[in-house]
Amino acid sequence: MSCTPVSTKCNDIWIDFSCTGPSVSELQKKEPNAWAAILRSQKNQQTAEDDTIIGSICDKQGLCSKDEYAYSQYCACVNSGTLWAECAFAPCNGNKNAYKTTEQRNILTNKQCPSGLTICQNIAEYGGTGNISDLYQNFNCNSVINTFLINVMNHPFLTLILIILILVIIYRLMSSSAAKQNGDKLPPPSLIFSNLNNF
């Protein structure tokens, strides 16, 4: 079964890798070097050469840069875009056929995974319109918790709104603490800004 790529953007975090991709027997016939690399990965014997053979979308080379394999089970570690995929992304760390790079192997063997990571099994949604990308990502973590990650930094208007909201919150916190200390209230922001216009 072929996995049709929805996106070929480097480090997209939308995919759940539920598509198994070409069967193991197909992979053995079509890509014997890649299958040998996966077998070495299963035994923690992968090499830098194996990393190159498997590749990734970001590398633009190797097995995992090809459309039919990019979102298959074999590429769930190298193409997931998930931080610490080898530690906390079930399609990667829970799948023996998912190739782990030498760097990922070293993190696992040296027990360098951060503590308290939430295991995310599926990524259910990915979206964005216009020039806003990665606007929402719905992670189904531990089959219970939905975590929404919002990236507004790709859109200047949304970034400006976020900065204004932060400044308003800071002003309110400062004015309430100053009022408690002095026993009187600071003037409202509108009065302050109107006085600034008089200068």
Curated annotation (Swiss-Prot):
Glycans are attached at N131. The keyword Transmembrane applies. Coiled coil: none annotated. One of its GO terms (cellular component) is host cell membrane. The chain crosses the membrane at residues 150-170. It is found in: Virion membrane; Host membrane. Keywords: Glycoprotein, Host membrane, Late protein, Membrane, Transmembrane, Transmembrane helix, Virion. Interacts with host PYCR2; this interaction results in autophagy activation. Essential for viral fusion with host endosomal membrane and core release. Not required for virus morphogenesis and egress. Induces complete autophagy through the interaction with and down-regulation of host PYCR2. Induction: Expressed in the late phase of the viral replicative cycle. It is a single-pass membrane protein. Belongs to the asfivirus E199L family. The keyword Nucleus does not apply. It comes from African swine fever virus (isolate Pig/Kenya/KEN-50/1950). Signal peptide: none annotated. This is Inner membrane protein E199L.
